[in-house]
């Protein structure tokens, strides 16, 4: 008997495929049955080798050894997933396996994960590709019935390979170069550093902003409505107008214009717009939203989340009304639901995957069992579908121009004619939406008629600086980066991809370059002193959002077969070579790069400073360190962050709430810090009541 080997990206997805295919016999690392073997990767099983694999001299960091630009790339099996790779290699090379199906995630990274395992295992068998946008059983069956030769995805693989190797070369060379120049570890990334630079630039704009006061005279009409004068920079001028207006009994209508306007429904979600709304409405980080969406996808409740499209293909038009009606019934919005399918259909704007949708499985699911975060994301996606196919929001706007005391005043009024899609949005998301103050209706007046003035007052305001970046605004900036410098006919891709932007933000936070400040719904992202210092010493080509956006656009062209991979890689290598040969240390920069002192070493009394991987004693022979990736805290379900480190160094103890036991139970405890005889840190637990 011969088998087809199916390789998924993770165990849970492999189990879902196995169930549909009838491979019900569970083995060590795979499922078997009905002519199928179904196994899985666990993320990236195969990774790019570190520099020292190419040459032992690279163990030591030296500018003289740069640039490091491999001619023949080498890969290693990840140590943590070596067993699973061994299982896959054995399955791939079994004599009774006659073909392999790549069933990893249908995107750039999923393609790379499979191809690297396939090549590292030395497999030569025919490969077909499974391409899914939904994990529903009928979608899985349809996908396996329409497998394509993997060669159709060679361009996608080439783009993934170029992205991985470019990131490696920029990260390895730039990090070593600047670390050596400034005598301390500095992490530099192709995408990470330009994003950090954007936040530093925004904070510089805010710091340089000088607010200017302005003054406005406001008239209240007896028949309803208010009118505003122009802005005055001098208070005395506004006060003079106010005095004159108070002497007048009325204002003369110079112009009255009434227009009917409409606001079209919003487009369906792609991942980035979902992440932006989830941050704005729910306070979720981009990574939290991606995690919740991925879980919903694997539970078959939404379609593939890592999409950059906001439209659907023509073949989906027939089933969409039923999906919308079913979704409306679940979320209490079925009343007066009108489905305009063509508003969301545009196959020409669909790339690898169509826009995010809830699936038909939502109607059969026990939604009460969903975690709160997942339910909130599902509600956003459902609401967006119903709004996107709904009626326009229609209103009548009246604009009055009046004259009082020789000065022009403007008033706007608004009357809603049809709530349209906004009524659905309020039904499904009403508790999340901020209540905006709508313009009141204005009296029905004619030109040259007189409006009695009920009152007049002076209002003071001031110009506002740019807003601090939160995740919503930063994601938007990443998405549109470089657009102004590109030709009009070039498709904008921005910095990163929908699948990687969240990870970029998290990496900047974890490495201490950005910090989140504020409460959950109003958290902003601020560059730390360390982040500002890094950007200060980085040359333009490393921190330029425009250059990074241009690279992303070229990766997209490679993916579409419009550009040769070698051309892109040559450009990256030339940039790195130029960087290494022309960059010198910035004078006075070392003062900016000082390590932050957070406390006193309990072992020797020297300063403890923060570095990338932990808090280290500055005294050379002392071995005291608090690792950020600390195993003791991991076992408690906690992370050793700067607040905890500060408490431990100051008080020798820190109280933690909701620690997790091995059995999943939660408890409160106090962590005590002491030192081993050789100076290394040692932790113990103290429980309430001395237990």
Located regions from the model:
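Amphipathic alpha-helical transducer elements in NTP-driven molecular machines
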Residues: 11-18, 35-38, 42, 78-89, ...
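Metal- or metallocofactor-binding catalytic centers and their adjacent structured scaffolds
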Residues: 235-269, 275
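Intrinsically disordered, low-complexity regulatory segments
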Residues: 1-164, 168, 438, 465
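Basic, low-complexity terminal or inter-domain segments flanking catalytic cores
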Residues: 2-5, 81, 92, 120, ...
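Short glycine-centered, acidic/aromatic-flanked micro-motifs in structured strand/loop junctions
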Residues: 104, 276, 306
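C-terminal or mid-to-C-terminal helical accessory/interaction module adjacent to the motor/catalytic core
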Residues: 73, 95, 137-221, 258-259
